[in-house]
């Protein structure tokens, strides 16, 4: 065994025996520092003959590289071991309740909470979430959805139009989230199963209407989607959202340009002492609109109505939030009143889950 082999064996043994980074650094300095054993060998290369340097140079440089590699590897091992030890000693008991400090406590807005509740319900049924821009083209907001040129929704008194562009075309603040249905059908191939929550805009302002409001729509496109499937989806949603064991629903024939046939859906309820309860009583309350996707809409999205079909539905998020949580006026939703939010808002850790009930 040569002197280099002996030195390498000793140095690697010292590296492996280093129990912490301080000890390892001491070994590194003793071997590779300015006055280290390997550094001293490198200095001898200058006094060697060319033949000796050609023979000894690669051996000494190889020794240096192997020692440096061993030091780096050992440093990584020690760092990982130190991290594991620290994590084990600093483990947090996540079962402990969160300490609340009322003076700094924030609240989740009811709209955000209800959107999360709706998302949890439909995710359990296999729906994905789709989103789109608030500013839309006339084509996506109206034409592709089978709105005729003279439809009242295209008038200034019902829709917010932006200034015309260079071509004289005007974009709009979307009046519904339906343009995202068009975008989805054009971008994806069936089967499609999505919900589309988001902001929408219309000229309207009173106790139950605001110029900006929130809506969630659902879209299912498949080869065999039918009204029976639509009815089941809506019943399951209403039971889960209002947290009742059963609901009675009635479908009233209606008209929407983008669905055929179309229906408005009422849900059974009772009104007692100013409180609305669902799943009981002899009264009815309109809750949403729905229908089978119109063949013209499928064609406008590049789909063959003879090969696929589907259904869609739309629910006002603000409205069902008011109904579920007993909020009499829609306008405070958007007034940024911290007192109102402290009363109607939700704690940050009130994450909706179907396991223990949405509001458990």
UniProtKB/Swiss-Prot annotation:
Stored Pfam families: Phe_tRNA-synt_N (PF02912), tRNA-synt_2d (PF01409)
GO molecular function, one term: magnesium ion binding
Cofactor note: Binds 2 magnesium ions per tetramer.
EC numbers, comma separated: 6.1.1.20
Biological processes, Gene Ontology terms: phenylalanyl-tRNA aminoacylation
UniProt cofactor(s): Mg(2+)
Protein name: Phenylalanine--tRNA ligase alpha subunit
């Amino acid at each position: 065994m040569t002197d280099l082999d002996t030195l390498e064996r000793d140095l690697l043994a010292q590296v492996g025996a280093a129990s912490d980074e301080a000890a390892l650094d001491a070994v590194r300095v003793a071997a590779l520092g300015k006055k280290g054993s390997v550094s001293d060998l490198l200095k001898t290369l200058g006094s060697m003959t060319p033949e000796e340097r050609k023979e000894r140079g690669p051996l000494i440089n190889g020794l240096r590289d192997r020692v440096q590699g061993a030091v780096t590897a050992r440093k990584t091992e020690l760092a990982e071991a130190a991290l594991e030890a620290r994590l084990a000693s600093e483990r947090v008991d996540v079962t402990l309740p969160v300490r609340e400090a009322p003076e700094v406590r924030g609240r989740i807005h009811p709209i955000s909470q209800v959107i999360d509740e709706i998302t949890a319900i439909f995710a359990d049924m296999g729906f994905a979430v789709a989103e789109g821009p608030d500013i839309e083209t006339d084509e996506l907001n109206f034409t592709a959805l089978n709105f005729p040129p003279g439809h009242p929704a295209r008038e200034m008194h019902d829709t917010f139009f932006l200034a015309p562009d260079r071509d004289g075309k005007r974009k709009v603040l979307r009046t519904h989230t339906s343009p995202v249905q068009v975008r989805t059908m054009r971008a994806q191939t069936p089967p499609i199963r999505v919900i589309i929550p988001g902001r929408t805009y219309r000229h309207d302002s009173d106790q139950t209407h605001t110029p900006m409001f929130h809506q969630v729509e659902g879209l299912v496109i498949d080869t065999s989607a039918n009204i029976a499937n639509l009815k089941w989806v809506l019943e399951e949603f209403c039971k889960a959202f209002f947290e009742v064991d059963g609901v009675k629903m009635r479908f009233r024939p209606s008209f929407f340009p983008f669905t055929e046939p179309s229906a408005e859906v009422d849900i059974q309820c009772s009104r007692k002492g100013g409180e609305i309860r669902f799943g009981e009583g002899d009264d009815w309350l309109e809750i949403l609109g729905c229908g089978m996707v119109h063949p013209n809409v499928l064609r406008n999205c590049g789909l063959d109505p003879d090969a696929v079909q589907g259904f869609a539905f739309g629910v006002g998020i603000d409205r069902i939030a008011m109904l579920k949580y007993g909020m009499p006026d829609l306008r405070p939703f958007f007034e940024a009143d911290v007192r109102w939010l402290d009363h109607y808002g939700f704690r940050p850790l009130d994450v909706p889950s179907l396991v223990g009930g949405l509001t458990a």
